[in-house]
Amino acid sequence: HLLIPWWNAYSFLVTYANVDGWTPPAAGARVPVSPNLLDRWILSTLDRVTGEVVAAMDAYDLQQAVRPLVQFIDDLTNWYIRRSRRRFWKSEDDADKTRAYETLHAVLLRLCQIAAPFVPFISEEIYRNLRTAGLPESVHLSDYPLPGGLARDEALEAQMAKVQEVVGLARQ
């Protein structure tokens, strides 16, 4: 339930990035603020999840630390990527497509760092394949991320939760 969708998200990025010849930005480059609501939502959600995982780990509650990761991977694969696919599939390279690649790349790298204590091998494999020059060679040598590094938008998160709820009710 957790690892295969995460691997598929990684595979999706790598497949389309290779087809388009996209290369990730240099290490340390901040993800530009995107006008796309889905980009802003997934980055905000990732920042919230980072905080939840850190708080649970600080309380030595590892079971509680994993729960937000499971939900986040579901949001990433079943909401963000599914609703962003057409942005990756466009034949022309434009700013929107580039931002989609940059966002997904940044999200997957951060996810590797957050999840590394719980699933070290897949985190390492994905990280090593996505890292750029200037980043530590191993996810386990990188600093553990803290919340606040990404732009939070709690109002957008609340709006998206309502949309997800409506879509979920319509599917039933």
Where are these regions (language model features)?
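Core structural elements
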Residues: H1-V14, N36-V49, A65-R87
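Short helix-adjacent coil turns
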Residues: M57-Q64
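Acidic, turn-prone loop/beta-hairpin segments
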Residues: V19-G51, R82-R171
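Short, well-ordered beta-strand elements within core beta-sheets of diverse protein domains
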Residues: V53-A55
